[in-house]
């Protein structure tokens, strides 16, 4: 037996080597778990330290946690905190936006978000609950299902975010803005895709917003205590409590340590069983190595194929990254377009208000214009009535004057007939005188006896000759007066025909003297009254005064402007344009000698042409 036991030094060395290899493998197995725990503790301490600084110094900073700091400085700060150099860092010398950026980086770069991958769908399902109380109770149950570290750290973070949104009037960070910033870091799926990012982004931000706003209800903390206790009192600052409280905490920690020791004992038993199984597996592995060497050659081809597939997958990943960049750029563009549209909307609302005010003013002006037009129409109607009255009175005056002229003409005719009779009588007397002279000449022999009778007869002859001369002069005067009266009759007939034809235009000029341009309205009245009043008062010996052309032109101008005003007012009431150069039209009418009856047609044609 001894040679078997003592003759196995190689076996002892093999056992020692096996023990060493097993210890190394155990160390390799245990080290990753310990490293993860240490890293978790460092990350939690760093997050608490960052929250403490931001909560005490940067609550009222505008754009806190939204504005991103310098990327290189954020990475340097994160490395220092990961290396455990948090106590030596002076945060006052660092940009506060870089501090908030480091906080977001720690939350984003973790292996698993605080709300965990397993509860992702459950948190999204809470959005479909419409009742607020039932929604909060459901979310509270989900929070209780979280690991304790996640639960405590989430409490510190949500308290910090709640205090930020309470100062949103200063820092411009509402609960919705904070939810947009922190939703991708707190809640995300295990396998992200473009579709999930597009569809679930709004619902994720809504869940985080509810967590921020309902922090007091979810963690059952009174609002008064919230302002008395800061986030660091939950795990960073030194205890300033009584010994009894510290003892209670110590008891809790002892219980936790006991639980930890029990877990370690359980792990040791597991490792011992694992060692026995590993010894058995080592022999199996030696056999497997032989088979693996044989299969190695066959796996070369598979590796090449796998590399190609990896390349394709890398290309797909790059294309997906590019797509994500495009989507983010599109989102930024859409946000900018929304801002621009809102600005345009505000401008349009202002323009609409101004247009409404202008429309009101225009409506008021239109009403005023309607009132003025009504007044003008009434004035025009009154003027037309006055014009008709004056026209009737003028026509009556013309008729009376015409009748007077006819009576005078009849008187002149009667006087002319009397003068003709006197002339014939004078001719007869001349013949008689000549006969008497011939008789006297025949009886010239009886001079002496008849001297006295001859003298008397000579006197009679002289008287008769004087009478004949007087009668001839009277006859000549009467003939001249007759010719003048005939001329006056022709002129009066012409004037009466023109007055009757231009009764619609010239008589209106005599009715409304306010609208005469160039001459006073009284001049036309004076000329017409002088022609009518002087004719019956004149003696038959003096001729009537001739008509003045200036007066006729002034009457025509007055008639034109009155007609033009009436036609323009009709066009204004109908809403038609009435921009006409009246002076040019008047010159055309006067130069072409167009009748007054046709003036209204010419003016209306000009109005239609200017449309």
Swiss-Prot record:
Composition-biased stretches (Low complexity): 495-509, 527-540
GO MF annotation list: GTPase activator activity
Spans annotated as Disordered: 476-550
One Pfam family here: RhoGAP
Biased composition, class Basic and acidic residues, residue ranges: 476-491
Subcellular location: Cytoplasm
InterPro entries: Rho_GTPase_activation_prot, RhoGAP_dom
Record Gene3D superfamilies: Rho GTPase activation protein
CDD domains the UniProt entry points to: RhoGAP
Ranges of residues in domain Rho-GAP: 24-219
Main location: cytoplasm
GO cellular component terms attached to this protein's record: cytoplasm
GO annotation terms (biological process): signal transduction
Residues annotated as site: Arginine finger: 66
Coiled-coil residues: 236-499
Keyword terms: Coiled coil, Cytoplasm, GTPase activation
Functional summary from the UniProt entry: Rho GTPase-activating protein involved in the signal transduction pathway.
Record's protein name: Rho GTPase-activating protein gacN
């Amino acid at each position: 037996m001894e040679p078997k036991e003592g003759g196995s030094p190689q076996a002892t060395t093999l056992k020692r080597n096996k023990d060493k290899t097993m210890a190394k493998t155990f160390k390799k197995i245990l080290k990753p778990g310990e490293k993860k725990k240490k890293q978790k503790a460092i990350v939690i301490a760093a997050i608490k330290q960052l929250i403490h600084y931001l909560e005490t110094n940067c609550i009222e900073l505008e754009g806190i946690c939204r504005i991103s700091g310098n990327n290189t400085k954020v990475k340097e700060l994160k490395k220092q905190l990961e290396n455990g150099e948090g106590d030596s860092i002076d945060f006052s010398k660092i940009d506060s936006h870089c501090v908030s950026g480091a906080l977001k980086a720690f939350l984003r770069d973790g292996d698993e978000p605080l709300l965990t991958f397993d509860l992702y769908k459950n948190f999204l399902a809470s959005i479909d609950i419409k009742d607020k109380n039932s929604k909060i109770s459901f979310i509270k149950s989900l929070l209780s299902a979280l690991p304790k570290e996640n639960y405590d750290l989430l409490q510190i973070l949500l308290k910090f975010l709640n205090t930020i949104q309470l100062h949103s009037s200063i820092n411009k960070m509402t609960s919705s803005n904070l939810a947009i910033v922190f939703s991708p870091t707190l809640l995300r799926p295990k396998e992200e895709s473009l579709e999930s990012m597009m569809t679930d982004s709004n619902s994720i931000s809504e869940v985080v917003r509810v967590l921020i706003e309902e922090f007091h209800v979810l963690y059952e903390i009174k609002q008064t205590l919230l302002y008395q206790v800061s986030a660091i009192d939950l795990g960073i600052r030194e205890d300033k409590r009584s010994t009894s409280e510290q003892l209670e905490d110590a008891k809790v920690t002892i219980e936790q340590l006991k639980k930890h020791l029990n877990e370690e004992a359980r792990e040791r038993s597991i490792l011992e069983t694992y060692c026995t199984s590993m010894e058995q597996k080592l022999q199996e592995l030696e056999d497997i190595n032989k088979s693996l060497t044989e299969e190695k050659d066959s796996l070369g081809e598979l590796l090449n194929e796998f590399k190609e597939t990896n390349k394709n997958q890398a290309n797909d990943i790059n294309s997906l990254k590019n797509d994500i960049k495009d989507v983010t750029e599109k989102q930024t563009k859409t946000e900018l377009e929304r801002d621009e549209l809102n600005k345009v909307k505000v401008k349009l609302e202002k323009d609409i208000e101004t247009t409404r005010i202008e429309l009101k003013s225009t409506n008021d002006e239109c009403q005023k214009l309607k009132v003025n037009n009504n007044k003008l129409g009434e004035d025009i109607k009154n003027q037309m009535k006055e014009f008709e009255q004056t026209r009737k009175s003028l026509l009556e005056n013309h008729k009376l004057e015409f009748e007077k002229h006819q009576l005078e003409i009849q008187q002149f005719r009667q006087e002319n007939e009397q003068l003709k009779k006197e002339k014939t009588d004078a001719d007869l007397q001349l013949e008689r005188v000549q006969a008497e002279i011939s008789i006297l000449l025949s009886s010239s022999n009886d001079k002496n006896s008849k001297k006295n009778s001859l003298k008397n007869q000579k006197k009679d002859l002289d008287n008769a000759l004087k009478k004949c001369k007087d009668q001839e002069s009277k006859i000549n005067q009467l003939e001249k007066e007759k010719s003048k009266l005939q001329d006056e009759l022709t002129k009066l007939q012409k004037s009466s025909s023109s007055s009757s034809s231009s009764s619609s235009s010239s008589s209106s000029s005599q009715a409304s003297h306010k609208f005469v341009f160039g001459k006073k309205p009284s001049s036309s009245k004076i000329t017409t009254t002088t022609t009518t009043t002087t004719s019956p008062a004149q003696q038959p010996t003096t001729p009537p005064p001739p008509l003045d052309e200036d007066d006729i032109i002034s009457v025509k101008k007055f008639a034109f402007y009155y007609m033009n005003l009436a036609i323009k007012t009709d066009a204004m009431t109908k809403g038609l344009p009435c921009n006409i150069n009246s002076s040019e039209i008047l010159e055309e009418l006067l130069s072409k000698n167009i009748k007054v009856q046709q003036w209204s047609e010419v003016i209306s044609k000009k109005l239609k042409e200017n449309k």
